Amino acid sequence: MGEVDIARVNQNIIKAKHYGAKLKAVPGTLKEAITDAIKTWTTNPDYAYICGSVVSANPFPKIVAFAQSIIGKEIREQSIEQEGKIPNMIVGCVGGGSNFAGAIYEFLDEASVKKIGVEAHETAALTNGTPGIMQGMKTYMLQTEDGAKSLGGMSLGAGITYFSVGPLHSYLKDQKAVTYSSATDAEMLE
């Protein structure tokens, strides 16, 4: 886990350690942690690699999106129970994209449900980035013009400071199946 993220999400660390997790801190954020995890996994045959977001190489984004789809199933069930119909719109925040992928997964074939993902403006890969390849995925990312270096930013939300986004969201953007926009920290606090 990135040292920056460790400092910001201490409660998650406490829970993970309670369940026996061993934590390896690496300098940086989620980006550096994923890169380090992939390097460690590919050089140690006894290790397994599991990613908790819809980022990284296939099949990990699909596995996580499927697991997170329980969110969309709950949205469907509760909407029908409380409103008598499925929702007209689903709006959610997008960092790497796992929570929002889970929220909309159940509704991808429902054209009547408008889907809006909102990124932190400071790290908005879908709205401000360009296509690139890193960490085993082709997706939109914040990077230098020549693609040689990834760029990042900081936001108040620890989970939305990733320099890129899962490839599912890139595909949905390109297919115009989901609308993506961004909001600044100040706008989010209003």
Predicted regions and their residues:
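A glycine-rich, Thr/Ser-enriched phosphate-binding loop motif common to dinucleotide/cofactor-binding enzymes
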Residues: 60-74
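Active-site/ligand-binding loops adjacent to catalytic centers
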Residues: 31-34, 38-59, 63, 83, ...
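Buried hydrophobic positions in well-ordered alpha/beta secondary-structure cores of metabolic enzymes
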Residues: 16, 75, 90-92, 97, ...
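A short, small-residue-rich loop immediately preceding and capping a beta-strand
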Residues: 1, 85-100, 118
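A glycine- and small-aliphatic-rich helix-loop capping segment at beta-alpha/alpha-beta transitions
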Residues: 14-15, 105-116
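Active-site-proximal loop->helix
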Residues: 1-38, 125-134
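Phosphate/pyrophosphate-binding loops at sites that engage ATP/ADP/AMP, CoA/4′-phosphopantetheine
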Residues: 77-85
